[in-house]
Amino acid sequence: MKTQTNAPPIGTAELRRATELLRQYRAGKAGLDRRIIENEEFWRLRHWEHIPEQGTTSLKTRSAWLVNVILSKHADAMDAYPEPACLPRAADDEAEAELLSKVLPVILDQNDFEKTWSDNWWKKLKAGVAVYGVFWDRSRNGGRGDVAIERVDPLNLYWEPGITDLQKSRNLFHVELTDNETLIEQWPELAGKLGGGSFTASRYLYDEAVDTTDKSPVIDWYYKKRVGGRSILHYVKFVGETVLFATENETQAALRGARPLAERGLYDHGQYPFFADVLFPEEGTPAGFGYVDICKDAQRQIDLMNNAIVANCVAAATPRWLKRGDDGINEAEYADWTRPFVHVQGSIEESALRQITVSPLSGNYLSILASKINEIKETSGNRDVNNGGISGGVTAASAIAAMQEQSGKLSRDQIQNSYRCFRQVVTCVIALIRQFYDAPRKLRITGAAGQNAYLCFDPARDLSREPVSLDIEVSAQKQSAYNRLSYNEMALQLFQLGFFNPELSDQALTALEMMDFKGRDKLRRTLTRNGTLLRRLLETQKALAVLVSGEAPAEAEQTGRHPHRRGGPVRGRQTDRIGNEQKKNAIAERARARAAALTQPR
């Protein structure tokens, strides 16, 4: 009797079902793919391919008002590059939160996250959605593995139609074309099975001739299952009908005492490793629309009017003539302005040659063009003041700065949306650290004083076994020039007002309670600590003075030998009616000193 082996949970039948499901998902987002590809053409100033032909003229002007909008918004996003900080929800978690706040910037820097942030903001502004991928890459860090934060092209991502949150999709697919030779080197069992896959993803219109005949689509299939009240994330990597990896097929644990991937899933956090950053959200889709979708109609109209105006200028600057067939004029010599003589046959009549008059355009057309340009500026919030320009009559520096700060509220709102997505990315990074960091790692961090410090990060020692609930606070690492200037001026004003004087700490703390600015809590802690140190110092000095003089504390006060009074009793300050210290006149003071010296008895 033959023994029948159990078939793996993920086989050929499951791959065929997944491929059919992927085709349905692709059909559901076909409209989004077309819009993203068209928007990319507008970004590259190739929108004339999407404008109907206007007559037989070959003149096609291209203005970059829409491009300027994207450039300005991207600059605002880079000024607000995020920096994470972990805040504990319980007193016992303060040490762990402080440690993760030091480790996270190192991981972001190792992933060159600033470039990922920049690239995704380009995509967000153009297409309306950018996607971050957070994975565990076993090949990093010399084979020890590390967290990988990558930019994911929305064209290569497929989700369930009708959902608004990627995490709520029943399945999620990521497709990427890979060279056949590379695949065979990594998976020799693919030899003879590659070439011309049954699924093709949407592609951009490249300048270069991109040949994909020797490439095959590698499909990453993510799906969730509910087991025991928790969501488990499973993962399948396949090409065609060949399974390369499947978590449900991994029934053996890699380490002794650990659970197999078939029970544990790919990641312990149970979430899809993709996070969408949407610019302008839409109902029924996790994607959105961008500035190209808002402004491309106005950009078309601007270029059409520019084309007509330039064509009119060219026609007016290039004289054309109505010529009778029997006028006897040598056309070649007449058209050549370098020929001093033009030969004719017979007599010349005025009706034989007449210039075509081109009527100049009215100023109304130029006003319409200017209004369309202003329409793009107003619609996108990219006014002149955002780029350093000022309105007529505004000359005060403070007024200009206030206008620039107020005009940036749209960018600040969009950046806050990106910060929310960034919190999800950081939370996923922390979960991967807990799951996969199994050995100490040496990291270079930034110390409290800005100097380089070196940290030996041991997850088994430094992190708790159970996940800790932390709040992720995101702040801009690079403040704008206006913000830096305002913070510096405020610090100088606080210094001049005596806020940092320990003797005035109680008054300064009272004033801080009514103020709101960045770093207020840190300043409050510093002033409280300085005031406490001063009180302890005064008490210690008083006790020492009593011990040295041998007098009782009350007698020391009466004789004026107070510990913090040097040179005898302290004279009170002379103040005006509102409490300000009166400034003394140097000449008058010298006169008083001479008079006192003369009148003192010898």
State the predicted function of each range.
Residues M1-Q54, K124, Y132, R138-G142, ...:
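C-terminal anchoring/interaction modules
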Residues M1-R256, P260, D268, C313, ...:
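Extended, helix-rich architectural segments
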Residues K237, P273-F274:
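Well-ordered beta-strand positions
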